[in-house]
Each structure stands twice: as C-alpha cells, then as structure tokens.
Regions:
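Non-transmembrane alpha-helical segments in soluble domains
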Residues: 39, 54, 75-78, 102, ...
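Penicillin-binding protein/beta-lactamase superfamily catalytic region
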Residues: 138, 152-211
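A short, well-structured edge-of-sheet supersecondary motif
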Residues: 1-18
Length: 211
C-alpha cells in the first residue's frame, strides 16, 4: 500500500511475501504508459495525433485495406474509438498481432463508438518502437529518467517481439506511484516539464461517454 498526499509519501506497506522491489504484472495500466509514450513522441514532432495510423505501417497494410481502417487516426486509437469492436489479435493469436489490427474486418467507422480494444494500445506500442528505435519501456525510462523507474521493470513482448503496450508492463508499486505523480502534476517534475501539460489534461479528461 502506498499513499502519497501533499507531495509526501505518508504510508508505505508491503505484506508477505511481497517486498518493495517485487515486480507485478500491471496488465491494463500498461495502456496509460503507452499513451504517455505517444505524447512524448508528439512533443518531439515525430507524429501528430491526427495522423492516419496506416501511414506508419505500410508493411502491414493489405492492398485492399478497408476504408474505415484507412481513415483511423492515432487519436481514435488513444480514445478507444477505433473501427474494431474487440481485440483483433485474439481472433488468431498465432498471426502477427500488429498486422491483425489492419486486416481483421472492422465493424463500424472509427471515431464514433467506444469499444475496449487492447489491440489498439498494442499497435500504438509498436508505433512507439518504430519511431523511437528502442523498446517502449526503455524509451520511457530515458525520456522520464528524472522519475527513477526501477531498473528491473520490463515489458512483456508478443510472439513477434513487440512490447505488449496493452497489458505487458511488469513493475513495482513505487514505479506506479512515480507515474501517477507525473500525471497529477501534469508532466512537471522537479521544475522540469517532461511532457506537455495540455496532452496530460486531454488524456485524463472525460472525452467519450461509455453508456
């Protein structure tokens, strides 16, 4: 248990057999890390949230790509308003997980309806790795080095070597607290703006009704 209040760690407790350095698979918290990595790349000018995702994966796109997939943007994916109603790679987990995002038939136009879609975050993690030239968590540790993420933390990969940006983060509770601190302070840490505050405000706001 970690409780941080008024910029102070007021409670920290671990229960056997767990220790402060015990790594836990964080599953869907991974998606938030992927979002921040995308925000960092946007700050670097390496992408725009309104870019069509297919422009970054020409090697994964079929010749007869569906127009709904062709129109889907990075912003649609971050908001989980893609053209898929479910996680695409679960259709056949032996096929290329990223490629499935572009080949599984869509169910509706992107940007319209919220559907929880882990393949969206997974494909965004692949995008981070393409544009940064390194594993996604390594990129985050480098860009956010002032936070001091644990050296032992890592990201699981799919069978094709892509970081599982939707569910693969394996880290300590303190790593999550440091990440939460970054968000709560809108990217400002020790007087340094690590990530644009506008991105964090948008990412943590209520953008899509789900009911």
């Amino acid at each position: 248990i970690l409780v941080y209040r008024h910029d102070c760690l007021v409670t920290e407790g671990y229960y056997a057999p767990y220790q402060p350095d015990t790594l836990h698979r964080m599953f869907s918290i991974s998606k938030s890390f992927t979002s921040i990595a995308i925000g960092l790349l946007a700050d670097e000018g390496k992408l725009s949230l309104n870019d069509p995702i297919i422009s970054y994966f020409p090697d994964k796109i079929p010749d007869d790509v569906h127009p709904w997939i062709a129109a889907m943007t990075i912003r649609d994916m971050l908001m989980m308003r893609t053209c898929h109603a479910s996680t695409t790679y679960k259709v056949n987990m032996q096929t290329d997980w990223v490629e499935s995002f572009f080949t599984v038939p869509p169910t509706h136009p992107a940007g319209k309806v919220f559907h929880y879609d882990t393949s969206s975050a997974h494909t965004l993690a692949a995008l981070v790795e393409r544009l940064s030239g390194m594993p996604m968590l390594d990129y985050l540790k480098e860009k956010l080095s002032v936070l001091g993420f644990s050296k032992e933390s890592y990201m699981l990969t799919d069978p094709f070597g892509v970081s599982m940006g939707g569910s693969g983060l394996t880290a300590t509770p303190m790593d999550l607290l440091k990440f939460a601190y970054l968000l709560a302070h809108e990217g400002l840490v020790d007087g340094k703006q690590l990530l644009s505050s506008s991105y964090i405000r948008e990412a943590t706001s209520n953008l899509t009704p789900t009911l």
